[in-house]
């Protein structure tokens, strides 16, 4: 019995080893999407409304923030005037309103992005990342952000943006 077992073990040892999984070079779609993320960040820093708007499929995309319960409570508690509308947990907007408010601001604005995850089949994609919104050196808010993208004849475009936000409880 020992002889046949040894022969099998010996034969198996000469078989080619299974291919090991190595990190693959990024595919072209992922590289293009990563460049889109960089252009998003650069347009905010440069207060480039036209460049920012070119990143989107159209102006009326889904654009929603979900604030943490604590952020909503703090904001509403800070309001002294009872006629000012109270904040809600989920708020909408648009990419144009966002970039135009940044462009009007006299202060430097930026969005730091980390832990970027891109999932794509080459036609549609999801981008998921951690962000911190900065006003100068002050970390104003942070959370998770998700984009839905589509590949058009003009390249990748953002079709929806949804994010969570924790507002900084400490003022600047």
Regions found by a protein language model. Name each.
Residues 1-4:
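Positively charged n-region of N-terminal signal peptides that target proteins for export
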Residues 7-17:
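Bacterial N-terminal signal peptides
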Residues 20-59, 172:
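Short, low-complexity N-terminal intrinsically disordered segments enriched in polar/charged residues
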Residues 56-59, 67, 129-133, 162-163:
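A mature extracytoplasmic/lumenal domain signature
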